[in-house]
């Protein structure tokens, strides 16, 4: 059963760095059709190999996110995230093309081009970071473009954001909805899950990933619904099928059914990193908990360090 997974050892970022440049490869090198990498804060980059089936699954999980966000083939998807070794641009584009939306692969930055294409191509959805979304909202407001664009939705991710920050760009752009997308290079890239219109937690693809939540100190499972470190096992990846990979991201599994009615399981939004935790008077404190308190005060802005 899936409970037997707990008998297997953990894997970690060190396993990927130790096997550089193509770590933990489980197929013949001739079967690898592409690589992606994450930017390492120290040492060498983590390079992950992909077979053609892996690329197809990457496209599938992103296409599912577009469907969950309520997009149709009539939508126009502007991609304003990084390309190259980073997975984001490739994933957003693969998913958009598989889904069947008109794809506009702009890349990050170049705010003038972003604004021009929003107007000229009547983009209905854009994929970007939360900080880029806020910048776009401010520039649209500054140039009085709100009545000239058709933007309805934003799918954002890859960096922390506050609730107030999200509310700010949603209101400034007059969006119908904004969606927080989850992902990590070790599990294809973006698209491992997305929040629904209810917005509580992230629906994730349980046929592609098995998620455990553990105590980062004891390495034992936490009680149901409690916050701990997310550990992910790939159920479909061919080239580098990571088993019990310690993400060091803090989250929780949400046991209750989602009010949206979907049977897709959920995990909570990422609350921080297990290595960011501090212990104050015997209590574990995480950055996400401090952010939750700050969000209770209307006079506190959405951008802080």
What are these regions (language model features)?
Residues 1-37, 42-60, 64-68, 72-74, ...:
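Nucleotide 5′-phosphate-binding alpha/beta core
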Residues 32, 55, 82-84, 131-132:
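Short glycine-enriched loops at secondary-structure junctions
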Residues 54-55, 81, 102-106:
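Short, flexible loop segments at the rims of nucleotide/cofactor-binding pockets, characterized by
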Residues 64-67, 94, 138-142:
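Short, well-ordered alpha-helices that flank and scaffold nucleotide-derived cofactor binding pockets
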Residues 99-305:
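Active-site glycine/GP-rich loop and adjacent strand/helix microenvironment
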């Amino acid at each position: 059963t899936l409970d037997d997974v707990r008998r297997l050892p953990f894997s970690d970022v060190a396993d990927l760095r130790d096997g550089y440049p193509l770590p933990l490869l489980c197929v013949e090198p001739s079967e690898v059709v592409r690589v992606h990498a994450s930017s390492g804060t120290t040492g060498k980059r983590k390079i992950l190999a992909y077979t053609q089936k892996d690329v197809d699954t990457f496209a599938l999980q992103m296409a599912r996110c577009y469907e969950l966000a309520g997009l149709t083939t009539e939508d126009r998807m502007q991609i304003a995230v990084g390309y190259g070794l980073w997975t984001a641009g490739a994933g957003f584009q693969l998913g958009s093309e598989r889904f069947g939306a008109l794809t506009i692969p702009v890349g990050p930055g170049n705010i003038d081009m972003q604004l021009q294409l929003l107007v000229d191509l009547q983009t209905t959805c854009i994929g970007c970071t939360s900080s880029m979304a806020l910048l776009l909202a401010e520039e649209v407001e500054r140039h009085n473009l709100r009545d000239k664009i058709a933007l309805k939705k934003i799918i954002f991710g890859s960096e922390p954001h506050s609730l107030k920050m999200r509310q700010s760009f949603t209101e400034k752009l007059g969006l119908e909805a904004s969606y927080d997308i989850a992902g990590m290079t070790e599990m294809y890239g973006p698209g491992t899950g997305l929040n629904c219109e209810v917005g509580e937690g992230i629906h994730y693809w349980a046929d592609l990933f098995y998620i455990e939540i553990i105590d980062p100190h004891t390495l034992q499972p936490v009680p149901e619904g409690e916050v701990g470190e997310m550990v992910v096992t790939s159920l479909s990846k061919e080239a580098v099928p990571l088993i019990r990979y310690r993400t060091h991201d803090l989250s929780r599994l949400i046991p209750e059914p989602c009010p949206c009615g979907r049977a897709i399981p959920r995990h909570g939004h990422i609350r921080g990193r297990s290595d960011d935790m501090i212990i104050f008077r015997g209590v574990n404190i995480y950055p996400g908990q401090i952010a939750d308190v700050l969000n209770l005060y209307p006079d506190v802005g959405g951008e802080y360090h």
